[in-house]
């Protein structure tokens, strides 16, 4: 769920080293009849559509520097293991056969994983409320030099509120829809996130996961967007480089507050959510400032909120972004391949997984969003038993993040992504900095 943009490839310990190109698993260059969302609109103006020019007809406003490395094959286990090591993965899955459907995969899941348990659902709420309250207590009592740790805990804890609202939106929290709407709205309020607008857009992410142009989460940067102007190019490079772990803020602003982005049947519910968010801001923020001042507002609300957006950006990037995971145009898109092959399971430190209610156990969630968060691990185990050879597995590590942030950038049919510094090396100082500054080891 971050703005439509790219990610990155990686594997540099110095400026002369180059990561092996991603294999051509199932990618596709856009045809002249496809429209795309402009990344700059996500950052500044809102969604507009622009006609994609075929790559061969693009104006050569930047000098491309191509590294003549033959793309490796991923047809056998040894090659996939090599790619996994290069990208920071534990496993890169085999291609799912074209004749396998999403229903085929779903039918192998135990029926119990779809069952809603009210006790477990409200236990999740208790965990989030308690951990968030503990975080606020730590912020209040911590000396200045321990505040970053308190903010990290509290930002992670409040991310749990988002996951609870996420379950409500997918009808996997309660059998009572009114309860889900109320809990979802309240859970999103500390994040000043409008529940219904997010729910409508997120449903489209699930319906069109990794579909070029149409997925409402992360997208590769369209080549013609990157070529359009030097100023825009620098903004894109910086936005998808150093500040990328907070770029979900741009997605939050762009997608959820403009009534024109919603269908007429959705507008009334969107207005209710917006009214709740604005009421929280109008009452909650002045109250915080009255009690602890503007610096207190920064200390108790803004910093944990930025911590939440770090996780929002990181989780959503890692879920669907890797050099070997393609985005496809609608006429080539396959639902089962997108949801199983195109989703990543990533293990994080246990305390993060607990506070965030296993949002990282993401493959079963894309097989069926109706699986409650507390049943995701059982569903994942079933998927590993029946479809494990097709899954992408990782443990959160520096190499994985370095790959995403320094390589998965501009859309390309053959390679899936082309890094910024291969297209505009003289303007890619932020990417060069990340390659030098980010450690290159995998846990």
UniProtKB/Swiss-Prot annotation:
The keyword Lipid metabolism applies. CDD domains: Delta12-FADS-like. Pathway: Lipid metabolism; polyunsaturated fatty acid biosynthesis. GO terms for cellular component: chloroplast membrane. It is found in: Plastid, Chloroplast membrane. It catalyses: a (9Z)-octadecenoyl-containing glycerolipid + 2 reduced [2Fe-2S]-[ferredoxin] + O2 + 2 H(+) = a (9Z,12Z)-octadecadienoyl-containing glycerolipid + 2 oxidized [2Fe-2S]-[ferredoxin] + 2 H2O. A motif (Histidine box-2) lies at residues 202-206. A motif (Histidine box-1) lies at residues 166-170. It is a peripheral membrane protein. InterPro entries: FA_desaturase_dom (IPR005804), Fatty_acid_desaturase (IPR012171). A motif (Histidine box-3) lies at residues 362-366. GO terms for biological process: unsaturated fatty acid biosynthetic process. It comes from the Eukaryota. Its EC number is 1.14.19.23. GO terms for molecular function: acyl-lipid (n+3)-(Z)-desaturase (ferredoxin) activity. The keyword Cell division does not apply. Coiled coil: none annotated. Keywords: Chloroplast, Fatty acid biosynthesis, Fatty acid metabolism, Lipid biosynthesis, Lipid metabolism, Membrane, Oxidoreductase, Plastid, Transit peptide. Its main location: plastid. Residues 1-64 form a transit peptide. Chloroplast omega-6 fatty acid desaturase introduces the second double bond in the biosynthesis of 16:3 and 18:3 fatty acids, important constituents of plant membranes. It is thought to use ferredoxin as an electron donor and to act on fatty acids esterified to galactolipids, sulfolipids and phosphatidylglycerol. PANTHER family: OMEGA-6 FATTY ACID DESATURASE, CHLOROPLASTIC (PTHR32100). Belongs to the fatty acid desaturase type 1 family. This is Omega-6 fatty acid desaturase, chloroplastic. It comes from Brassica napus (Rape).
């Amino acid at each position: 769920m971050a703005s439509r943009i790219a990610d990155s490839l990686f594997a540099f310990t110095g400026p002369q080293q180059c990561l092996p190109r991603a294999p051509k698993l199932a990618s596709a260059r856009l045809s002249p009849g496809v429209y795309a969302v402009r990344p700059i609109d996500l950052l500044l103006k809102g969604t507009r559509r622009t006609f994609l020019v075929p790559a061969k007809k693009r104006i050569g406003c930047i000098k491309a520097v191509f590294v003549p490395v033959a793309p490796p094959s991923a047809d056998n286990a040894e090659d996939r293991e090599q790619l996994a090591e290069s990208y920071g993965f534990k496993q890169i899955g085999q291609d799912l056969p074209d004749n396998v459907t999403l229903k085929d995969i779903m039918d192998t899941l135990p029926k119990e994983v779809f069952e809603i348990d009210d006790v477990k659902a409200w236990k999740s709420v208790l965990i989030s409320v308690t951990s968030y309250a503990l975080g606020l207590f730590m912020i209040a009592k911590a000396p200045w030099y321990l505040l970053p740790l308190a903010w990290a805990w509290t930002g992670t804890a409040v991310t749990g509120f988002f996951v609870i609202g996420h379950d409500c939106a997918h009808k996997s929290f309660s059998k009572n829809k009114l309860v889900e709407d109320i809990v979802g709205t309240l859970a999103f309020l500390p994040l000043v996130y409008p529940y219904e607008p997010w729910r409508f857009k997120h449903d489209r992410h699930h319906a069109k996961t990794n579909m070029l142009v149409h997925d409402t989460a992360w997208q590769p940067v369209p080549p013609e967007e990157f070529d359009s102007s030097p100023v825009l190019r620098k903004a894109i490079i910086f936005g998808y480089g150093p500040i990328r772990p907070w770029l979900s803020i741009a997605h939050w602003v762009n997608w959820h507050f403009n009534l024109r982005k919603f269908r007429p049947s959705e507008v009334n519910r969107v207005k209710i959510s917006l009214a709740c968010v604005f009421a929280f801001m109008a009452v909650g923020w002045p109250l915080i400032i009255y009690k602890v001042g503007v610096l207190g507002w920064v200390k108790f609300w803004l910093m944990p909120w930025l911590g939440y957006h770090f996780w929002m950006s990181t989780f959503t990037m890692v879920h669907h972004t890797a050099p070997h995971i393609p985005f496809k145009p609608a006429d080539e898109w396959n639902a089962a391949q997108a949801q199983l092959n195109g989703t990543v399971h990533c293990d994080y430190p246990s305390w993060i997984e607990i506070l965030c209610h296993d949002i990282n156990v993401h493959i079963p969630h894309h097989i069926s969003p109706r699986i409650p968060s507390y049943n995701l691990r059982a569903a994942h185990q079933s998927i590993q038993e029946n479809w494990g050879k097709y899954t992408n597995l990782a443990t959160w590590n520096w190499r994985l993040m370095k790959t995403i942030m320094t390589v998965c950038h501009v859309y390309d049919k053959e390679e899936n992504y082309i890094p910024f510094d291969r297209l505009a090396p003289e303007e890619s100082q932020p990417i060069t900095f990340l390659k030098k500054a980010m450690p290159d080891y995998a846990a």
